[in-house]
């Protein structure tokens, strides 16, 4: 709530009521073609859904699109050399983009392109993850090898990957001597970085060099396993994507909804 008033006898005015979905609702509306904010506002004003027939001459219906939509944040880190791009609870994004595709991987790839991240079609990926993520890292490494990428990892991560029978090279952390990850990134030998760390101040400080080296050399990086897994799915579509218009997708949805019998 945003409230304004002065003095003990002041009239208090409620200037704003924010439902904390101010950016998610427009995204879902754009993904489905449904004016959710308008529908919700009319419900709050007392108008039942059945009476809201302004959309295609029918009452609002649940929409389950046959495609995927992904919202991705845009960050300004490349404008601030030397800053650690690891994310925390504070707001750091300066905008958002949306990727739409017939598969999750295609939508993910489009969202990354829109946000300014370039995913390689070939090359070497470095993986260094915390212990809790090693099992998931094995699957990611296996998928990368199947896609034709070379995989290198720090000692502990490499051991977990190798134990699963996935080919992997070993690269040093900075504290273990040269050549280390930052050296390979600066030399152009790494095209993609997957790195996760324990959420402790020391672990974050120790791994800062990986993130800053990737940022300084414009190497795309991911700092969560969810991000790494999604990016790996996107790499499966790196050879080409199909451009689609939201208008055409929404029209197809409307055709399907028009054929849906009333409840």
Place the predicted regions along the sequence by residue:
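Peripheral docking tails and interdomain loops at the edges
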Residues: 172-173, 178-263
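Conserved active-site and cofactor/substrate-binding residues in soluble primary-metabolism enzymes
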Residues: 31, 35, 39, 92, ...
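ATP-dependent carboxylate activation and anion-phosphoryl transfer catalytic cores
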Residues: 1-121
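Catalytic domains of riboflavin
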Residues: 56, 77-79, 84, 88-95, ...
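Short, solvent-exposed amphipathic alpha-helical segments in soluble enzyme
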Residues: 31, 112-115, 139-146, 167, ...
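Active-site proximal loops enriched in glycine and acidic residues that flank catalytic Cys/His/Asp
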Residues: 1-5, 16-19, 72-74, 101-102, ...
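Short acidic, glycine/serine/threonine-rich loops at helix termini
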Residues: 10-16, 26-29, 53-54, 82, ...
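Conserved structured catalytic cores and adjacent interaction surfaces
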Residues: 120-192, 196-204
């Amino acid at each position: 709530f945003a409230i304004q008033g002065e003095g003990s006898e002041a009239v208090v005015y409620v200037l704003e009521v924010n439902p904390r979905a101010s950016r998610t609702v427009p995204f879902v509306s754009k993904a489905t073609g449904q004016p959710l904010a308008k529908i919700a506002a009319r419900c709050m004003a007392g108008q039942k859904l059945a009476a809201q027939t302004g959309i295609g001459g029918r009452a609002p219906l649940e929409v389950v699109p046959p495609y995927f939509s992904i919202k991705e944040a845009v960050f300004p880190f490349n404008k601030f050399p030397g800053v650690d791009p690891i994310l925390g609870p504070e707001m750091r994004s300066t905008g958002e983009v949306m990727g739409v595709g017939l598969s999750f991987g295609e939508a993910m790839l489009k969202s990354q392109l829109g946000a300014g991240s370039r995913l390689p079609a070939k090359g070497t990926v470095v993986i260094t993850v915390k212990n809790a993520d090693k099992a998931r890292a094995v699957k990611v490494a296996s998928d990368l090898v199947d896609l034709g990428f070379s995989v290198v990892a720090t000692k502990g991560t490499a051991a977990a990957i190798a134990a699963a029978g996935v080919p992997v090279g070993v690269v040093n952390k900075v504290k273990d001597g040269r050549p280390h990850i930052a050296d390979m990134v600066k030399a152009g030998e790494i095209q993609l970085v997957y790195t996760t760390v324990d959420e402790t101040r020391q672990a974050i400080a120790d791994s800062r060099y990986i993130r800053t080296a990737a940022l300084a050399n414009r190497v795309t990086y991911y700092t969560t396993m969810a991000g790494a897994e999604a990016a790996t799915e996107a790499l499966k579509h790196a050879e080409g994507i199909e451009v689609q218009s939201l208008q055409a997708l929404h029209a197809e949805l409307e055709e399907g909804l028009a054929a849906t019998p009333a409840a």
